[in-house]
Each structure stands twice: as C-alpha cells, then as structure tokens.
Amino acid sequence: MDIDFRVAIVLAPIAVAAGWAAFNIGAAAIRQVQNFLNREA
C-alpha cells in the first residue's frame, strides 16, 4: 500500500490548526471550569 504524500501535505496544516485550536479552547475551558468550581466553594 503506497501512501500519496500529497494528501498528507494537504491535511498536515489542517491537522496542526485543529490541534492548536483544540489546545487553546481546551485551556480556556479548563480555566473557566476551575473558576466556576472555586467560586462555588
């Protein structure tokens, strides 16, 4: 099975962008949940 590297070249930046977005959104979401829990306590 031969991999077509053009597909990887096209998908790599999309995957990096999606990962970066998930990282940023995840960090903000965790911060928000922690603030909510600290406020309730």
Swiss-Prot record:
Keywords: Membrane, Photosynthesis, Photosystem II, Thylakoid, Transmembrane, Transmembrane helix
Top-level taxonomic group: Bacteria
GO annotation, cellular component aspect: photosystem II; plasma membrane-derived thylakoid membrane
Residue stretches spanning the membrane: 7-25
Main localization, broad class: membrane
One record GO biological process: photosynthesis
Keyword Thylakoid attached: yes
Membrane topology per record: Single-pass membrane protein
InterPro entries registered for this protein in UniProt: PSII_PsbY
Compartments where located: Cellular thylakoid membrane
UniProt KW Transmembrane helix keyword: yes
Subunit structure: PSII is composed of 1 copy each of membrane proteins PsbA, PsbB, PsbC, PsbD, PsbE, PsbF, PsbH, PsbI, PsbJ, PsbK, PsbL, PsbM, PsbT, PsbX, PsbY, PsbZ, Psb30/Ycf12, peripheral proteins PsbO, CyanoQ (PsbQ), PsbU, PsbV and a large number of cofactors. It forms dimeric complexes.
Function comment: Loosely associated component of the core of photosystem II (PSII), it is not always seen in crystals. PSII is a light-driven water plastoquinone oxidoreductase, using light energy to abstract electrons from H(2)O, generating a proton gradient subsequently used for ATP formation.
Family named by the database record: Belongs to the PsbY family.
Protein name, UniProt field: Photosystem II reaction center protein Y
